Design a protein with these regions (language model features):
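Primarily marks hydrophobic transmembrane alpha-helices of the MFS/SLC 12-helix fold
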Residues: 104-107
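C-terminal ends and interior cores of transmembrane alpha-helices
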Residues: 112-125
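Core transmembrane helices of Major Facilitator Superfamily
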Residues: 136-148
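Pair of pore-lining "gating" transmembrane helices in MFS-fold secondary transporters
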Residues: 24-64
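Symmetry-related core transmembrane helices of the 12-TM Major Facilitator Superfamily/SLC fold
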Residues: 199-222
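Helix-breaking motifs and short loop linkers at transmembrane-helix boundaries and internal kinks
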Residues: 102, 123-128
Length: 231
C-alpha cells in the first residue's frame, strides 16, 4: 500500500516547493534551488543575446561593410532566412544530443557560441564572411531554443510546468527590455573613445555582449544540474 501511495504521489507531481508561495512552483526530485536559480538566470539573458545580433546589423552594413542602403533590407532578410533554415535543420539533432549527454553542456555551449559569434561578426570584411559568421551564430540559436523548454520540463513537476514556463518567458521579455536598450546606447560611447572610427567602434560594441555571453555560459556550466535527464 505504501508503495502504491508513493507511486500515485510521484505521478501527481508533488515535488519540493520553490519560490514565492503564490506561484506554487514545485521542482522535481534531485533538482536544487541552485539549479532553479541558474535556469532563471539563463532565461533572463536568452532572448536579449539572441536578438542583439539583428539590432547591430544596420550599423555593420552601413559603416563596416559599406552595403548600399537599397541592398540592406534583402541582405538582412537573407541572413535571417538562412539562420532559420539552420535552426530548423539542427534543433532535433540538438535535442537528441541533450537527451544523451545532458542539458548543461548544450545550453552552456549555446552561449559560448553566441560569445564567439559576437567576436567574429564585426571582423567580417565581406558579406560572405558575415553570412558564414551568422550561420555559426545560428547554431547557438538552435541550442538555446531547444534547451530552455527542455530544462524547464526536467526541473518542474508536471503540475507546475506551465507556471514555470510563464516565469521563464517573462524573464525572457524582461531581459530583452533591460539588456537590449543599454547595449544599443553603448555605441555612441564607443564611437567617442575611438575618435569616430566605425570599425573599431563596431568591434568594441559587439565584443561587449560577447563578454556577457561568456559569463552566462560559465554560469550555466557551473549551476545547471549535471548528467542526462534520466540521471
Amino acid at each position: 500500500m505504501n508503495r502504491l501511495n508513493e507511486s500515485v504521489e510521484g505521478a501527481s507531481g508533488v515535488g519540493e516547493p520553490f519560490g514565492p508561495r503564490k506561484l506554487n512552483l514545485r521542482i522535481a526530485p534531485g533538482v536544487t534551488t541552485g539549479h532553479m536559480m541558474t535556469l532563471l538566470f539563463g532565461s533572463f539573458f536568452g532572448i536579449a543575446m539572441m536578438g542583439f545580433i539583428n539590432a547591430c546589423q544596420p550599423y555593420l552594413f552601413t559603416e563596416v561593410l559599406n552595403v548600399p542602403t537599397a541592398e540592406q533590407g534583402p541582405l538582412a532578410g537573407n541572413l535571417t532566412f538562412l539562420s532559420e533554415i539552420l535552426v530548423v535543420a539542427t534543433i532535433g539533432i540538438i535535442g537528441a544530443m541533450s537527451d544523451k549527454f545532458g542539458r548543461k553542456p548544450i545550453w552552456a555551449g549555446a552561449f559560448l557560441i553566441f560569445s564567439i559569434g559576437y567576436v567574429l561578426y564585426p571582423l567580417a570584411q565581406t558579406v560572405e564572411q558575415l553570412t558564414a559568421f551568422r550561420l555559426f551564430f545560428a547554431l547557438g540559436l538552435a541550442m538555446n531554443t531547444a534547451m530552455l523548454p527542455s530544462v524547464i520540463n526536467d526541473y518542474a513537476v508536471e503540475a507546475s510546468r506551465g507556471r514555470l514556463i510563464s516565469v521563464c518567458f517573462m524573464l525572457n521579455g524582461l531581459g530583452f527590455i533591460l539588456l537590449l536598450t543599454p547595449l544599443r546606447l553603448l555605441l555612441p560611447y564607443f564611437e567617442g573613445i575611438v575618435d569616430g572610427d566605425p570599425v573599431l567602434a563596431a568591434r568594441y560594441w559587439l565584443w561587449t555582449p560577447a563578454a556577457v555571453c561568456l559569463l552566462v555560459s560559465t554560469g550555466l556550466l557551473i549551476g545547471l544540474k549535471p548528467g542526462a535527464p534520466a540521471q
